[in-house]
Amino acid sequence: MAVMTPRRERSSLLSRALQVTAAAATALVTAVSLAAPAHAANPYERGPNPTDALLEASSGPFSVSEENVSRLSASGFGGGTIYYPRENNTYGAVAISPGYTGTEASIAWLGERIASHGFVVITIDTITTLDQPDSRAEQLNAALNHMINRASSTVRSRIDSSRLAVMGHSMGGGGTLRLASQRPDLKAAIPLTPWHLNKNWSSVTVPTLIIGADLDTIAPVATHAKPFYNSLPSSISKAYLELDGATHFAPNIPNKIIGKYSVAWLKRFVDNDTRYTQFLCPGPRDGLFGEVEEYRSTCPF
């Protein structure tokens, strides 16, 4: 019977320890390699890692081109402009409506801003400037259909028609809520200082960000934006952001808060890009001397 000397015993113990260490290291590397690419596996992720500075800038990381949609060529809406990233890839698509008596020019800045973060965006003129919210819902839907089916091949080839969203100002915001209630397949809705006679949107299941303005006397938040938000089901992803010191017409000029949180919402829910959750949960700080009067949501998303 062989007898193990102290030297051989120490050598054997060291060998077994090294084997155990190597096995543990291999298991750790395997676990890390499996867990690390979680967000990278998202096929809809576009653009660099987001920062506050990037989202608050006047334009995003993508160069943008435009395509005019004449009133004569438009079907079901009043024409407009399509903004799209020059980079050849597929993107979610967004339609944006102006408000009562407003024209496309009043929301044009949003088209270019959002497109520069990796979306195909159409800003529209309505058939008449006096069109009511439910008519604007129909026109937003027609604008989405135009981008998917009738725009140039350059635009159509860039659109992922399974990832659509709508936005609108004032009565366009009311139209946004109406279309969201009619099309649960939409990935996101963003009403901006919205106006609508209907106060109950409990049928909406689309992730919805409502942006109100504390000095709005046309669609006061107490009778519009807040009741709209409160009526949305608590089971859906939703958020309410109230601008501090802003009026009903805040969405008509470039606004870094509207731009930042609109892009973050679209990225999170149209692109399923969780890199943007950090800007929405817990969201902006509100209170005295800030740019945001109030923020609340159904975080976590």
Swiss-Prot record:
Keywords: Disulfide bond, Hydrolase, Periplasm, Secreted, Serine esterase, Signal. It catalyses: pentanoate ester + H2O = pentanoate + an aliphatic alcohol + H(+); an octanoate ester + H2O = an aliphatic alcohol + octanoate + H(+); decanoate ester + H2O = decanoate + an aliphatic alcohol + H(+); a dodecanoate ester + H2O = an aliphatic alcohol + dodecanoate + H(+). This is Cutinase cut2. Residues 1-40 form the signal peptide. Monomer. Disulfide bonds join C281-C299. The keyword NADP does not apply. PANTHER family: DIENELACTONE HYDROLASE DOMAIN-CONTAINING PROTEIN-RELATED, POLYKETIDE TRANSFERASE AF380. Optimum pH is 8. Optimum pH is 6.0-6.5. Optimum pH is 7.5. Its EC number is 3.1.1.74, 3.1.1.101. It is found in: Secreted; Periplasm. The lineage of its organism: Bacteria, Bacillati, Actinomycetota, Actinomycetes, Streptosporangiales. It comes from Thermobifida fusca (Thermomonospora fusca).
